[in-house]
Swiss-Prot record:
It comes from Pyrobaculum neutrophilum (strain DSM 2338 / JCM 9278 / NBRC 100436 / V24Sta) (Thermoproteus neutrophilus). The gene is rpl34e. Pfam families: Ribosomal_L34e. This is Large ribosomal subunit protein eL34. GO terms for cellular component: ribonucleoprotein complex; ribosome. PROSITE patterns: RIBOSOMAL_L34E. Keywords: Ribonucleoprotein, Ribosomal protein. The lineage of its organism: Archaea, Thermoproteota, Thermoprotei, Thermoproteales, Thermoproteaceae. One of its GO terms (molecular function) is structural constituent of ribosome.
Amino acid sequence: MPRPAYRSRSVRRIKVRTPGGRTAVHYEKRAKGAPRCPITGLAIGGMNKKIYRFGVSNRAPTRPYGGVFSHKALARAIRLAVRK
């Protein structure tokens, strides 16, 4: 039986053929996707998904709600706020 940490479905299972001829199971973390806007579902522009060693403040755009909402959702929210 695998270790308790490997019983979770949050880790990928990869079957690997060993030099001895048997098949072993290797576990690895699932790849993270690009950050997405919670309103429109679009990928957030300006956010690099490969630079996870930096904090969000260093890799997010400097516009209001940068790194949280997409440009379309932000433009819609600004228009609604100005109209009120």
